[in-house]
Amino acid sequence: WNSVVLAYKFIDYLDQNPTLIPENIVVTVIPSLNPDGIYKIIGKVGRFTSLDVPSGKSTVPGRFNANEVDLNRNFDCKWQPKSKWRDSVVSAGQEAFSEPEAKALRDFILKDKPDAVLFWHSQSGAVYASECEKGILPETISIMNIFSRASGYRAITTFDAYETTGDAEGWLASIGIPTITVELTTHETIEWEKNLAGIKALFEYYK
């Protein structure tokens, strides 16, 4: 849930500081791709703060949507019906993009054609590149290193803790969109200053 709180904070910050965004850049912030999962944990619809999060409650159920599908295994990059998340086998849906949330992001991406995408997750305290079956895009390496230097997060080119299939980041890489994932250090903190520094560095790079 902390990555969602961070996204909302960025929305507020950019609304209050519009001149921070270079004139040639359009920024879209999607706070969460999984409202069902958020509702399982928070118990409310729409925006929330850290004060709304029940203490001591497991956040694992919030990983999955109402169909008990891991949405970050439902994209068209080496998709399989079953995938892994940590030590667990998880459902990746009936087929790639079987879930409405994954379809919504796919349709938005194909319509808007962003120059770059950044995901916020937690927790490992690092920024990761993305790849599918054709390797890492050179631009992805560039923005990963730029964000890493500005924020202080470790830069990691390949996630190798366990094999993943059907991830959104990999799908974006497969269609030629540079994508990085910033993993916050814990499941509670938003590390605002580090992430603000990283975003400012990306604005400077793309202006």
Predicted features by range, described:
Residues 116-119, 126-138, 159-207:
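Active-site-adjacent mobile loop/cap segments within catalytic or ligand-binding domains
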Residues 50-62, 148-157, 186-200:
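Short, surface-exposed, charge-dense and proline/glycine-enriched linear segments
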Residues 1-138, 145:
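Active-site/substrate-binding loop(s) of hydrolase catalytic cores
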Residues 26-28, 154, 178:
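Conserved beta-strand segments of alpha/beta enzyme cores
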Residues 104, 108, 143-150, 201-205:
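Generic non-transmembrane alpha-helical segments
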Residues 141-160, 167:
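Short, flexible loop segments at boundaries between secondary-structure elements
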